[in-house]
Design a protein with these regions (language model features):
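Basic, nucleic-acid-binding surfaces and adjacent catalytic neighborhoods in DNA/RNA-processing proteins
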Residues: 5-130
Length: 130
């Protein structure tokens, strides 16, 4: 995943960045939980359209994608409800969540909000994510 690749895919897009991240044809492997965490880490609003992202935001986004996914893999993923891996172990990345599932909680002088976008829960900090 390179900055140029992502820029080329989204710079004319009217689609919001949260949906772009979930589109497996553009970037494979990002699910709903990780999309919220990645957008928070990169300080980008989930409602921002692809065409409105500046190159410095795309750079931050790609760095956040890499960091969040590497950390999640090292932690064995996120165990929500009854998921276990093939060897029976539970993932523990959920202990690293900054925003996902934390609606109403305060972080960095901001109250985490939850909205439903295209039928998916989206957690974000309106003050920090623009």
């Amino acid at each position: 995943l390179t900055n140029k690749y992502l820029f080329d895919k989204i710079h004319k897009s009217e689609v919001i960045i949260k949906q772009i991240l979930l589109n497996q044809k553009i970037i494979a492997g990002i699910g709903n939980i990780y999309a919220s965490e990645i957008l928070f880490a990169s300080r980008i609003s989930p409602f921002k359209k692809g065409k409105d992202l500046k190159m410095k935001e795309i750079n931050r986004l790609i760095l956040s994608i890499r960091l969040i996914l590497i950390k999640a893999i090292r932690c064995g993923g996120s165990t929500i409800r009854n998921y276990v891996s093939s060897d029976g172990t539970l993932g523990n990345f959920q202990s690293n969540f900054k925003v996902y599932g934390k609606s109403g909680k305060k972080i960095a002088n901001c109250i985490i909000k939850k909205d439903i976008l295209y039928g998916r829960s989206t957690f974000y900090c309106p003050k920090l994510q623009r």
